[in-house]
């Protein structure tokens, strides 16, 4: 696709994080304290100091993006950063968001696990919809409800909590939970539940080395508070969730969908994605 790739060692995040002025860190920390719905400090995995480290990491990534003129990015994180520094959840969420503690900004696509095909798919979605793009694991199917729970460790932009460009609409619905045993370095996991609405889902993937694009429609759904909580606890409560009903059968989806990651924006973008695939000279497979 004629995309140049810059490989930047993630030790640069640690180096640059140390140079962030404490005054900037404290200002961001105060903004999060005032605006996030609830921060669940536990004195171990999530402390004010660890949250401030995540803020420093965010400024470090902003510096890398600026210095290398990156249009979009990804962070490997596991296991070096997540074992020994902090998780990148806060960084990834607010890069993908249309705002942070410094004010409004254009969403910068940042894929967790340095998933390059995720970043490519998300960048296409961003140019089409001009909104943040969901990055999620295809985690669990609730057969009794006919819904998928799309979950990721903290990558979901907080935009999806309220589907608004105004942080005052979204952030009261967001919780910062302590990271679990997967990530011993700790930090905050950015928890919320995707706002209901019709959505389009897609993923660039490969078959025998050749790219193709999976495309499907569906909707994000919610239930009453008790049921939402019970469902989220069946996977990982601390992580962000998107309860999703696809417009295709489980069998059709499972037969050919070729990734554990999936991406989405609100609205119907099937025709536009098919046109993009045609321009790129790749197959578009529309489910349903």
Language-model regions: role of each:
Residues 27-30, 94-98, 156-159, 227, ...:
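Short, surface-exposed linear patches
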Residues 1-131:
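Conserved, well-structured core segments that form the ligand-binding/active-site neighborhood
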Residues 110-116, 120-227:
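Long, charge-rich C-terminal accessory regions
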Residues 78-80, 140, 165, 269-270:
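Short, glycine-/Ser/Thr-/acidic-enriched flexible segments
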Residues 178-288:
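Extended hydrophobic packing segments that form well-structured cores
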Residues 5, 133-135, 284-286:
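Short secondary-structure junctions
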Residues 1-13, 153-157, 167-168, 173, ...:
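Solvent-exposed, charged interface segments at domain starts and junctions
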């Amino acid at each position: 696709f004629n995309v140049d790739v810059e490989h930047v060692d993630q030790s640069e995040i640690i180096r640059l994080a140390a140079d962030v002025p404490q005054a900037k860190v404290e200002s961001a920390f105060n903004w999060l304290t005032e605006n996030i719905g609830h921060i669940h400090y536990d004195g171990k995995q999530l402390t004010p100091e660890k949250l401030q480290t995540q803020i420093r990491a965010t400024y470090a990534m902003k510096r890398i993006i600026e210095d290398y003129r990156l249009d979009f990015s990804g962070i490997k994180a596991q296991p070096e950063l997540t074992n020994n520094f902090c998780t990148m959840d806060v960084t990834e969420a607010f890069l993908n968001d249309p705002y942070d503690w410094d004010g409004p900004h254009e969403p910068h696509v940042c894929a967790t696990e340095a998933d390059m095909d995720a970043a490519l798919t998300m960048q296409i979605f961003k140019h089409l919809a001009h909104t943040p793009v969901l990055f999620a694991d295809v985690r669990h199917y609730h057969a009794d409800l006919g819904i998928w729970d799309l979950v990721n460790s903290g990558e979901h932009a907080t935009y999806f909590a309220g589907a608004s460009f105004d942080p005052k609409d979204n952030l009261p619905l967001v919780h910062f939970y302590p990271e679990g045993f997967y990530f011993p370095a700790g930090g905050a996991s950015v928890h919320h539940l995707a706002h209901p609405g019709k959505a389009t889902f897609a993923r660039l993937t490969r078959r025998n080395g050749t790219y193709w694009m999976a495309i499907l429609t569906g909707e994000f759904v919610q239930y009453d508070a008790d049921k939402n909580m019970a469902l989220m606890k069946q996977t990982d409560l601390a992580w962000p969730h998107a309860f999703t009903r696809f417009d295709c059968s489980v069998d059709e989806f499972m037969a050919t969908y070729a990734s554990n990651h999936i991406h989405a924006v609100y609205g119907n973008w099937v025709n536009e994605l098919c046109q993009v695939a045609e321009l790129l000279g790749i197959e578009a497979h529309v489910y349903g």
